[in-house]
Amino acid sequence: ISRPVAVRAVAPTGTIGILGGTSTGIEPIFAVAYKRRYLKNRRWHFQHVVDSAAQEMIELYDIKPDKIESALDLAEDYERRLNFQANVQEYVDMAISSTINLPGWDTEKNNEDGVEKFTQTLAKYAHRLRGFTCFPDGCRGGQPLTPISYEEAIEKLGEEFEDNIQTHDICDISGSSGICGV
């Protein structure tokens, strides 16, 4: 009988955790509150959501929503995020795949001037990392999650909204636009 080659792993569960309302592995919460967009019956729908871990901190420990650190807060301190993942990776046999959220492109915090600094920081940790994704905010049209205020989410919690846009086969690239997706 062969021995297991690895015993410790952290699954890439960002989206799965959000859908299940549970832990997302080593990922920080995306945002305290967000709008979740999804396709239902060929139409885009969305709901306002309060992250379950954030809600628990608010209710049980009386922590103010604006004091809860999220992936969007860490976007401005990507070195801290990379360092954390590299430190955890030392104790995990398999690769940790994690999303490094970045500020939107061409903003004060993410622009041509910052590319060299980001490259140097990434090079500093790359030998200790096995997997990651960089995702600048707003880099994809129709993002599935959009941060909103806690107050807005509480006000509209439990309601389902429908966008006015009807979709066709989301990956039908035979149409005139030649674009797959939204």
Feature locations, PLM:
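Catalytic alpha/beta core of large soluble enzyme barrels
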Residues: 3, 8-174, 178-182
